[in-house]
Amino acid sequence: MQKYTSEARQLLALAIPVILAQVAQTAMGFVDTVMAGGYSATDMAAVAIGTSIWLPAILFGHGLLLALTPVIAQLNGSGRRERIAHQVRQGFWLAGFVSVLVMIVLWNAGYIIRSMHNIDPALADKAVGYLRALLWGAPGYLFFQVARNQCEGLAKTKPGMVMGFLGLLVNIPVNYIFIYGHFGMPELGGIGCGVATAAVYWVMFIAMLSYIKHARSMRDIRNEKGFGKPDSVVMKRLIQLGLPIALALFFEVTLFAVVALLVSPLGIVDVAGHQIALNFSSLMFVLPMSLAAAVTIRVGYRLGQGSTLDAQTAARTGLGVGICMAVVTAIFTVTLRKHIALLYNDNPEVVALAAQLMLLAAVYQISDSIQVIGSGILRGYKDTRSIFFITFTAYWVLGLPSGYILALTDLVVDRMGPAGFWMGFIIGLTSAAVLMMLRMRYLQRQPSAIILQRAAR
């Protein structure tokens, strides 16, 4: 019991800064929306449309680079710290290549935006302008993620938290300058949010790089030999590990976007109620997602040390802590769901629907916690391909079709509307949780030599 208590303390010490960093990131998006809305409703809508395209594109790159964390954690655990700098250099090369692809996609996103049904031309132009300003921040964001993954792989999650809040503090005044045109800058409205956010990502990257350069604990792994050439072998391995994570993230983000599109014809009340419940459940998701990042670090580190039993302890402890958190947040959601809905909107019909959907959200929080922490465990074991197959099957083969059938058809029961899609979420997330646990159990039953051989690749 003592080993689990000790492991839980170490997991929480890693997870809490990640949670706070995510809060800062969410707050940046909130600030952009509010400040653009203060300029005009059209600018706020433009930022929202632009963000809906930016997120899938940049999260694909973000997911690809998540491969660095378990790689660095295992090198650190095995005492092969001299190899970390080379992995990080290749991470920067990979981030650079992916940045170019992301920038090309975002530059041409106008074709997608202008093809949207009945979109106002002025709104479309502002959304395109916002994305074309924001895309210059894509390299800064992805380079920052490489540096952050280096720190987190070395079990240092506080720097990412500090840089997150630094970014938030810089974002507010820079937004003000470019939205309203102060200090000789042009008045750009919502497009100014894109300029500000792009600048903030570069500030965060430079600040993180400065921290790494001066941190005594990383003195032995600093890059002292220049930037070096791309290493096709290392980059291929990072892509093999990272691509399934990137695709899983992409399919998860697009799933919720597709559901939002399917709900939109059902009416204003249904759309508003769905959006409130989804926004709140996304906030609750920060907790298990951050814990999953910590579990990846701990499992990877223990495997690097050559201890499959300690890796199992880290995995089980992460699941236990995650389930406890999910029970608490589920009780909180059920108890206060109407009060929470009232914080967003005071329309009685919207509040009633949002409260009903939040009840369903409370049901799936435990499954959601298990599946995301399970994903973190599998990342620690470098078993990322299974994450993609499980996520795709659970969300797109089971969750979305069943949600569609329940929400919009009479095949099983009378049409349930938005609640049907949320039942689909429950089916999809529960399926993912079960499959993740089965895969984890299968891996942990392998002989130690095979587990460690996979981890060392």
Swiss-Prot record:
Topological domain spans for side Cytoplasmic: 1-10, 74-92, 148-159, 209-242, 297-313, 371-386, 439-457
HAMAP family: MdtK
Name of the protein: Multidrug resistance protein MdtK
Entry's transmembrane regions: 11-31, 53-73, 93-113, 127-147, 160-180, 188-208, 243-263, 276-296, 314-334, 350-370, 387-407, 418-438
Localization per Swiss-Prot or TrEMBL: Cell inner membrane
Ranges in the topological domain labelled Extracellular: 32-52, 114-126, 181-187, 264-275, 335-349, 408-417
Record key words, sorted: Antiport, Cell inner membrane, Cell membrane, Ion transport, Membrane, Sodium, Sodium transport, Transmembrane, Transmembrane helix, Transport
Disulfide bonds: none
Coiled-coil region(s): none
